[in-house]
Amino acid sequence: MKKIGIVIFLMLALAVLYSCQEYEMVQYGAGQQINFMGDYYLGQNKEPYWEDDTAYLHYEVNFGINPLGDSLRVDTVLIGVKISGAMVDYPRKVVFKTDAPDENALEVLFPETYYVPADTGQAVFKILLKRPATRNVTYSANLTFDYAQSDFEAGTLERQFFRLKAEDTVNLGLWGSYEEEWDGYYAMYFGDYSETKARYLITKY
């Protein structure tokens, strides 16, 4: 009986050891999965604060409301990624692609080849959004990973897409003004309101 008890104990110990090793492989092994991170302050001209929360995996820009006017052709966006699995001592390639609708597809430019540096589990990359070709229309695209060309596998499902939207729209409300202000002040110098006049004034004030 004593020998049987020892055998059972050893079998249980081996089972526990195997399950622990299997767990560690899942948690820290060679899975090398990639996920998007979101910047809590994205679009607010502040230092990035990266979050895993999916609520921050989006970015919207209005090219119409900017002091550069029509000369602003692209908008720069910082995209953060986080890697699960063990860190490695060599750079690993990340390739993005977009999933966009058939109409009003936002054009996204990738100005460089992207790599996650060695010995790190996070990286930040720069992408460019092109100004929409048509005014007063919302353009959109989902940024995702090209897994076939990247050195990573897909991570958490809900963190595999980063939503992008852009428009080129101007009206009094978006400019931060209102009809009474225009009629009571700007109309004395520029006459009746028009979008063209508002776009000009945005570049001056």
Locate the predicted segments by residue.
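Positively charged n-region of N-terminal signal peptides that target proteins for export
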Residues: M1-G5
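Short beta-strand and strand-turn-strand segments in soluble, beta-rich domains
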Residues: D99-Y115
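Exposed aromatic-hydrophobic patches
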Residues: Q122-K130
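Acidic/polar, low-complexity intrinsically disordered N-terminal segments immediately downstream
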Residues: Q21-E103, G173-Y205
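C-terminal motif of bacterial Sec signal peptides marking the signal peptidase cleavage site
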Residues: V16-S19
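Short proline/glycine- and polar residue-rich coil/turn motifs
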Residues: Y114-Q122
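Short glycine/proline/serine/threonine-rich loop/turn segments at secondary-structure transition edges
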Residues: A133-S140
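Beta-sandwich strand segments
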Residues: Q27-Y28, Q149-F162
